[in-house]
Curated annotation (Swiss-Prot):
PTM-bearing positions, type N6,N6,N6-trimethyllysine: K14
Lineage: Eukaryota, Viridiplantae, Streptophyta, Chlorokybophyceae, Chlorokybales
Subunit structure: Heterohexadecamer of 8 large chains and 8 small chains; disulfide-linked. The disulfide link is formed within the large subunit homodimers.
Catalytic activity: 2 (2R)-3-phosphoglycerate + 2 H(+) = D-ribulose 1,5-bisphosphate + CO2 + H2O; D-ribulose 1,5-bisphosphate + O2 = 2-phosphoglycolate + (2R)-3-phosphoglycerate + 2 H(+)
EC category: lyase
Cofactor: Mg(2+)
Residues annotated to bind substrate: N123, T173, K177, R295, H327, S379
UniProt miscellaneous comment: The basic functional RuBisCO is composed of a large chain homodimer in a 'head-to-tail' conformation. In form I RuBisCO this homodimer is arranged in a barrel-like tetramer with the small subunits forming a tetrameric 'cap' on each end of the 'barrel'.
E.C. code: 4.1.1.39
Alphabetic keyword roster: Acetylation, Calvin cycle, Carbon dioxide fixation, Chloroplast, Disulfide bond, Lyase, Magnesium, Metal-binding, Methylation, Monooxygenase, Oxidoreductase, Photorespiration, Photosynthesis, Plastid
Record-linked Pfam families: RuBisCO_large (PF00016), RuBisCO_large_N (PF02788)
GN (gene name): rbcL
Protein name: Ribulose bisphosphate carboxylase large chain
Length: 475
């Protein structure tokens, strides 16, 4: 029998619980070009110092756990740990702080938004020492950006595919969103496209339900696209929603869209998941399909000011995962979107290099190192009277999507599409002539309506419609 081993106090590693800030709060740390940087809005529980709370965020989203473990000695914590390197109080709030955390690049799998989010916005958001936690922004270093394919094609390639330049693109979501048969659905698509729209769209919750199976919808929509193209001489598209219960089924639907020769498919990237979205994005690039992204479920994640993830982070994640369009709010319609905040993440979607600008909620300078851009889609409660503001706010590289603002026209879908196209062309021409859309917008629409009975009828229907609620998420 082997002799009993005596355990002496003080030998081996020192077990027990110690303050996170002793290891993970490092105010003297100089960030590296390869670090992923995060800005968290945190609300500590009463009695928890902000330094301890910030260090806890850094620890629990990287290498730390609640107690010292002996396997800490088998690796280099200094190399792999996250570091809370700065904390600043939030102006106007009693117990709220912005904690800045730096993460070494080696903590994350290359080309995986799924792995990135699993760490940075994982279990730490349920940590008891925090009353609330929100990820406000991420700085993605060029070294990590280069591991992603990004959008299947990007803005310039899409314009070349469509042969459409110098103006925003026009779209429409087919309504009612649920309940139409495939044939009636295709008829609605055709009427909108022949009236002058560039795209029509499946609603986000149109997948493959008993009233309209996906294959039937794809066929009737393809017929509508080809017929409208033949009549107008323009390239048309319909966002065929490939979102499905499994990745295999999703890719099967995308493959069928490719066989039909249509230009674009669609995915609900948050409900579908980043792994599925990245897989579909790769398929779309390999097979020449554009990819429209809907952000269903985003408000569950980003609408509360103190807890969750800001949409600018979700937008950056989408640009890495891949998508050629994404819904971004309207500023002027029925859905959430404060102007400066919205324009901040619109720039993060489209531009190659974006400077830090706290007035627009951009916490870090972001260099996308030529990753293709994403077209923002303005959609939700917009109509012809909004056209000047939308053209001025979003510029040419955008998609303006009028659902009820097309299909609600008193004369039908095609006249509704005509009204929107005439309004857009009038606004673009006025802007190119140097007129101020913000000041003269209503007059520009009225002048155009004199020569377009369809636009005049639309102006009359929606002259009193306004959505004047204050945005919840402001700077």
């Amino acid at each position: 029998m082997s002799p009993q081993t005596e355990t002496r106090t003080g030998t081996g590693f020192k077990a027990g619980v110690k303050d996170y800030r002793l290891t993970y709060y490092t105010p003297d740390y100089v960030t590296k070009e390869t670090d992923i940087l995060a800005a968290f809005r945190m609300t500590p529980q009463p009695g928890v110092p902000p330094e301890e709370a910030g260090a806890a965020v850094a620890a629990e989203s990287s290498t730390g756990t609640w107690t010292t473990v002996w396997t800490d000695g088998l690796t280099s914590l200094d190399r792999y740990k996250g570091r809370c390197y700065d904390i600043e109080p939030v102006a106007g709030e009693d117990n709220q702080y912005i904690a800045y955390v730096a993460y070494p690049l080696d903590l994350f799998e290359e080309g995986s938004v799924t792995n990135l989010f699993t760490s940075i916005v994982g279990n730490v958001f349920g940590f008891k020492a925090l009353r609330a936690l929100r990820l406000e922004d991420l700085r993605i270093p060029p070294a990590y950006v280069k591991t992603f394919q990004g959008p299947p094609h990007g803005i310039q390639v899409e314009r070349d595919k469509l042969n459409k330049y110098g103006r925003p693109l026009l779209g429409c979501t087919i309504k009612p969103k649920l309940g139409l048969s495939a044939k009636n659905y295709g008829r609605a698509v055709y009427e909108c496209l022949r009236g002058g729209l560039d795209f029509t769209k499946d609603d986000e919750n149109v997948n493959s339900q008993p009233f309209m199976r996906w294959r039937d919808r794809f066929l009737f929509c393809a017929e509508a696209i080809y017929k409208a193209q033949a009549e107008t001489g323009e390239i048309k598209g319909h966002y065929l929603n490939a979102t499905a219960g499994t990745c295999e089924e999703m890719l099967k639907r995308a493959e069928y869209a490719k066989e039909l020769g249509v230009p674009i498919v669609m995915h609900d990237y948050l409900t579908g998941g980043f792994t599925a979205n990245t897989s579909l994005s790769h398929y779309c690039r390999d097979n020449g399909l554009l990819l429209h992204i809907h952000r269903a479920m985003h408000a569950v994640i980003d609408r509360q000011r103190n807890h969750g993830i800001h949409f600018r982070v979700l937008a950056k994640a989408l640009r890495m995962s891949g998508g050629d369009h994404i819904h971004s709010g309207t500023v002027v319609g029925k859905l959430e979107g404060e102007r400066e905040v919205t324009l901040g993440f619109v720039d993060l979607l489209r531009d190659d290099y974006i400077e830090k600008d706290r007035s627009r909620g951009i916490y870090f300078t972001q260099d996308w190192v030529s990753l293709p851009g994403v077209l923002p889609v303005a959609s939700g409660g917009i109509h012809v009277w909004h056209m000047p503001a939308l053209t001025e706010i979003f510029g040419d590289d955008s998609v303006l999507q009028f659902g009820g603002g097309t299909l609600g026209h008193p004369w039908g879908n095609a006249p509704g599409a005509v009204a929107n196209r005439v309004a857009l062309e009038a606004c673009v021409q006025a802007r190119n002539e140097g007129r101020d859309l913000a000041r003269e917008g209503n007059n520009i629409i009225r002048e155009a309506a004199k020569f377009s009975p369809e636009l005049a009828a639309a102006c009359e229907v929606w002259k009193e419609i306004k959505f004047e609620f204050e945005t919840i998420d402001t700077l």
